[in-house]
């Protein structure tokens, strides 16, 4: 089992779980350093909240938020991902040292694919956008399929998506991002505040890894890394 951990840094004032905590560049850079120390293999920088009801922003504002952070994090010796659906932001991020573009919407995928030409960058995209990719087999080594847990989905749909990971993994690398989304509360019936469902979040990450996910995108890096290390040790003994 080989599953990397992607740590989330939201450089936003309004993300659903930690909006505003890391909005200043120095705070976001410190957050990234802490996640790396906790064992993150990849840092995912986001400048726009994708929570339901969030106010969209233009690519210029998004880039003004993440650009100064990306330049510093790219020098920390870790893979850097940029969470954006704006091709303009993605293009600038690649030039600034990003290794992965994480796009949660299908519509921009054709433009994002153009950015792969002449660059070694990789692309995360919704599995629903697979039909938009011409000759996907030639690009598979540079793509990650995202089942899109928690994006306008019911509890039953989220569970089915998680159970579909083995089949998705036959098509290519799978990235699962279910951290701090409502699925844990939906599955347990708990009404605790955001960030208090660490056990459930880690359980989903471990499940995803066991089912064949190549990357889990999480807020609670330290706990997830520890759980995956224990799982690997148990499998090896």
Q: Model segments located where?
A:
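Short beta-strands and strand-loop turn motifs
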Residues: 12, 43-47, 124-127, 144-149
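N-terminal amphipathic alpha-helix/helix-capping segment at the start of soluble metabolic enzymes
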Residues: 1-16, 30, 237
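Generic enzyme active-site microenvironment
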Residues: 8, 42, 81, 144, ...
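Residue-level signal for inorganic ion chemistry
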Residues: 39, 101, 145
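Active-site-adjacent loop and "lid" segments of alpha/beta metabolic enzymes
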Residues: 17-26, 30, 50-71, 79, ...
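Short, basic, low-complexity termini and linkers enriched in Ser/Thr/Gly/Pro
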Residues: 1-2, 131-141, 237
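Catalytic domains of carbohydrate-active enzymes, especially glycoside hydrolases
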Residues: 30-46, 211
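Short helix-capping segments at alpha-helix termini
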Residues: 73-78, 138-141
